[in-house]
């Protein structure tokens, strides 16, 4: 039936959770999925994508979300911004496109934290602990 169950690799009108992602690698993975030409796709969040055109749109949406996030973090890190400033910088690019989507406000702090880490050279995601969670919120609320 040519159906892909992508899990959180692809979202449909929902924020991507990237707190433990490899952001630089994600677009290549989306390229591989695109090349498979699925007729239907079940995303991690959002409605099932029931036509090839809807699948293409879901893949493009996810690529845009992840690329906008990571590019913004790379720009911020290149300018020496801390996590709080990176969040503000990233919101300028992300909010106009994604602020209205499901779980955006919930995911964004974790997404920006991971993007800032990866853009700073932290290749492998750090484990989320209660302490790390508190540190993140403290940094973001400065």
Question: PLM features: what roles do these ranges have?
Answer:
Residues 1-28, 32:
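Catalytic core of the metallo-beta-lactamase
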Residues 13, 72-76, 93, 97:
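Alpha-helix C-capping/helix-to-loop hinge sites
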Residues 14-18, 75, 116:
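Short, well-ordered beta-strand elements within core beta-sheets of diverse protein domains
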Residues 17, 57-61, 103:
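Alpha-helix capping and helix-loop boundary segments enriched in small/acidic/polar residues
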Residues 27-85, 89:
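Divalent-metal (often Zn2+) His-rich catalytic cores of metallo-beta-lactamase-fold enzymes
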Residues 79-142:
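C-terminal regulatory/interaction regions
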């Amino acid at each position: 039936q040519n159906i892909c169950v992508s899990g959180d690799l692809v979202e449909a009108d929902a924020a991507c959770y990237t707190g433990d992602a490899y952001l630089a690698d994600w677009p290549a993975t989306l390229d591989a999925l695109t090349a498979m030409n699925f007729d239907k796709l079940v995303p991690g969040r959002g409605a099932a994508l029931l036509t090839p055109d809807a699948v293409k749109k879901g893949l493009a949406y996810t690529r845009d979300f992840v690329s906008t996030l990571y590019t913004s973090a790379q720009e911020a890190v290149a300018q020496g911004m801390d996590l709080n400033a990176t969040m503000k910088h990233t919101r300028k690019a992300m909010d106009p496109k994604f602020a209205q989507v499901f779980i955006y406000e919930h995911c964004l702090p974790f997404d920006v934290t991971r993007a800032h880490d990866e853009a700073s050279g932290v290749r492998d995601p750090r484990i989320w602990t209660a302490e790390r969670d508190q540190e993140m919120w403290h940094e973001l609320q400065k």
